[in-house]
Design a protein with these regions (language model features):
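Bacterial N-terminal signal peptides
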Residues: 4-18
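Conserved beta-strand hairpin/beta-sheet module of binuclear metal-dependent hydrolase folds
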Residues: 30-78, 179-191
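Short acidic-hydrophobic surface loop/beta-edge motif
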Residues: 30-32, 54, 156-160, 226-228
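Divalent metal-coordination and catalytic microenvironments
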Residues: 35, 54, 64, 79, ...
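Metallo-beta-lactamase
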Residues: 59-61, 65-69, 157, 164-252
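Active-site HxH/HxHxD metal-binding segment of metal-dependent hydrolases
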Residues: 77-157
Length: 314
């Protein structure tokens, strides 16, 4: 069933789930600090994205849950090889299905799921829009995705015993992005705010916000290890290179628009610029959409999910 679901998702949204291989490992667990682990998925993996987990003295926090329950169960099994401590929290870095599809596995394990407030509102409805032609059973899977139990607005600190984990709202890839910072290990889980040598999905992006977010991450974490949403682990230099890609993309599109180029001319000129500069990046098939989405954004015509009206108390 999930194969059909992923196929629809790939066509409709071009999430990076193409070229799935039945014999490819779903992910590799890498220890990147004391009690800090990244689950890195190859492009051909059925996991669909990267994830990770952090172990403290009183429990475990998981960052993202992959695209479906099967790889999420594999991640749970890997955690159990490392520790028997309870899985207390899951952080969804944003609402996209490739990072939230396994929430149910960890909810059943007793975890509290936390995300930015926009994720709570968008997780089902906005993922559902990617499946307009799906069968009822497939749509039901999206409609039953496990929602976050806790929704925050700007920042929240989580303690696993004495271990501090900082969850911060930093928009760009979507309007509901979170990063998870592990100060004592100098590690930042960036979700899809960071694509390591891969062209990103811009379907919900505000590239102006994204560039500012990446600049703040570089300034605040100049020596950190970054866990990307797609691709391998990233260094501060890698984050800077990804930032520079977004700047190159925006500047190239803006320049072509100012020159009055047609959509076809704009796409051709910017595509040539990008392909020359980023020859070794993955997901080259995303380049045309990156250009189209950025052009729409700069024209003020791009449609992205609308943030819900805040609920005020008395």
């Amino acid at each position: 069933m999930i194969t059909k679901l992923v196929a629809v998702l790939t066509c409709a949204v071009w999430f990076p789930l193409s070229a799935l291989a039945a014999d490819a490992p779903d992910f590799t667990v890498k220890k990147i600090g004391e009690g800090v682990y990244a689950a890195i998925s190859p492009d051909s993996s059925k996991a669909g994205s990267n994830a990770g987990f952090i172990v403290g003295s009183t429990g475990v926090l998981v960052v993202d849950t992959f695209v479906d329950v099967a790889p999420a169960k594999e991640l749970l099994a890997e955690i159990r090889k490392t520790t028997d401590l309870p899985i207390r929290f899951v952080v969804n870095t944003h609402y996209h299905l490739d990072h939230t599809g396994g929430n149910a596995v960890f909810a059943e394990a007793g975890a509290t799921i936390l995300a930015h407030r926009n994720v709570r509102y968008w997780l089902r409805s906005e993922n559902m829009k990617f499946f307009p032609d799906a069968k009822a059973e497939q749509q039901a899977r999206v409609a039953s995705l496990v929602l976050p139990d806790v929704a925050y607005t700007d920042a929240v600190d989580i303690y696993l015993g004495s271990r501090l984990l900082q969850v911060r709202y930093m928009p760009g890839h979507t309007g509901g992005d979170s990063v998870v910072i592990v100060p004592d290990a100098n590690v930042v889980f960036g979700g899809d705010l960071i694509w390591q040598k891969h062209f990103p999905n811009l379907i919900d992006a505000n590239t102006a916000d994204w560039i500012k977010t990446l600049e703040k991450l570089q300034a605040d974490h100049s020596s950190a290890t970054f866990v990307s949403g797609h691709g391998d682990l990233a260094t501060p230099e890698d984050v800077r290179n990804f930032h520079d890609y977004l700047v190159t993309l925006r500047d190239g599109v803006a320049r072509a628009q100012a020159q009055g180029k047609s959509d076809q001319e704009l796409s051709a000129s910017v595509s040539a610029l990008i392909k020359e500069k980023y020859t070794d990046w993955g997901f080259q098939q995303f380049i045309p959409r990156n250009i189209q989405q950025t052009a729409a954004e700069l024209r003020g015509e791009k449609k992205v999910p609308v943030a819900p009206t805040p609920v005020t108390g008395r």
